[in-house]
Amino acid sequence: MKKFSKIGIVGFKDKSADLANALDQIADWAATHPKVEFFALDSLKGLAKKPIHVIKESGLSRMDLLLAIGGDGTVLSAAHIALGHNIPILGVNAGRVGFLAESRVEGLAKTLDDLLAGDFSTRERMMID
């Protein structure tokens, strides 16, 4: 079972009204789970609160997991970042449809608890060049 101690966050401020809510939930959760560190894409600097760290996109390639908070476009952007690094991606739907997302902002704390407990499954996806 894979352990997630470094989790990257990908999202776009102008694309999702629920992104700030999701980041607040993550910050609250992270404050009570110090063994898990969160690193947000530097474009989220104004929204990400401590203990979430802000880093450049290149730093996300060293994460154990990427949370893509937004819609399908955000998941695809996270896939581009993860390409060649074998990093799993969890899509968190903060939009209307979210075909590629497995979770919703409303249940984010439970999702993080499940990840920490190892209560998850993965699916391999193909990317066409």
How would you describe each model-predicted region?
Residues N86-S103:
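Short, acidic/small-residue loops that bind anionic groups at enzyme active sites
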Residues L66, A94-V97, A117:
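Generic secondary-structure boundary/loop-capping signal
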Residues D72-V75, A79, I87, V105, ...:
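Generic internal hydrophobic packing segments that stabilize the cores of diverse globular domains
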Residues F99-D129:
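Catalytic core of DAGKc-family lipid kinases
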